[in-house]
């Protein structure tokens, strides 16, 4: 499944959430975010970081095979007033349109995490209003190289949390992904599951 298709599907989820969050300002937005959809990771002085655990999945290659090294995930950031002012100030300095930015509350970013390359590409960035409607959209906004980020970097902590979640919920991601497992990956997963079951059995015998 491509990143664009995922963005379209998640757009429908944001629209549904907008009905629930209508009129909610950023100060209260975190309390209103549906916890069964969004996984909270961290909050800084400027924003809260979430990812959509109902839509996180693996990408598929050109042959329709699931690529276990590439994760597609929609993310959500909730801004505080200082971050809102910072975003607006930067847009004003760059002479970009400001229509709708009086109601800025956060941003949606669609990530493609390439585990083999060690990169995270933001395939799209959307600034959101208080009803989670899109104010503006930027394609292929930026790319991060994980190795170049400090372990204390909040972005790296966010990305690592998503990667860890994906590893712990691999079966869920596979079922959700739009593709089929290659025979090689199916064999590797079967071996991993057999090894895990063996270790679990050994632990049960000798706690």
Regions found by a protein language model. Name each.
Residues 27-109, 113-207:
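N-terminal secretory-pathway/extracellular module detecting exported/lumenal segments
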């Amino acid at each position: 499944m491509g990143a664009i298709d995922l963005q379209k599907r998640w757009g429908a989820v944001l629209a549904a959430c907008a009905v629930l969050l209508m009129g909610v300002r950023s100060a209260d937005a975190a309390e209103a975010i549906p916890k069964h959809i969004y996984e909270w990771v961290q909050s800084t002085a400027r924003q809260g970081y979430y990812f959509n655990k109902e839509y996180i999945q693996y990408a598929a290659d050109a042959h329709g095979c699931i690529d276990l090294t590439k994760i597609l995930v929609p993310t959500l950031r909730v801004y505080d007033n200082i971050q809102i002012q910072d975003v607006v100030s930067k847009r004003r300095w760059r002479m970009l349109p400001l229509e709708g930015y009086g109601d800025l509350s956060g941003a949606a970013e669609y990530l493609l995490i390439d585990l083999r390359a060690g990169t995270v590409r933001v395939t799209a960035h959307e600034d959101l209003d208080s009803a989670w409607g899109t104010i503006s959209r930027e394609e292929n906004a930026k790319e991060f190289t994980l190795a170049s980020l400090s372990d204390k970097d909040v972005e790296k902590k966010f990305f690592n949390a998503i990667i860890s979640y994906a590893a712990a919920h691999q079966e869920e991601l596979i079922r959700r992904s739009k593709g089929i497992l290659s025979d090689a990956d199916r064999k590797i997963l079967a071996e991993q599951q057999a090894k895990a079951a063996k270790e679990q059995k050994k632990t049960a015998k000798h706690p």
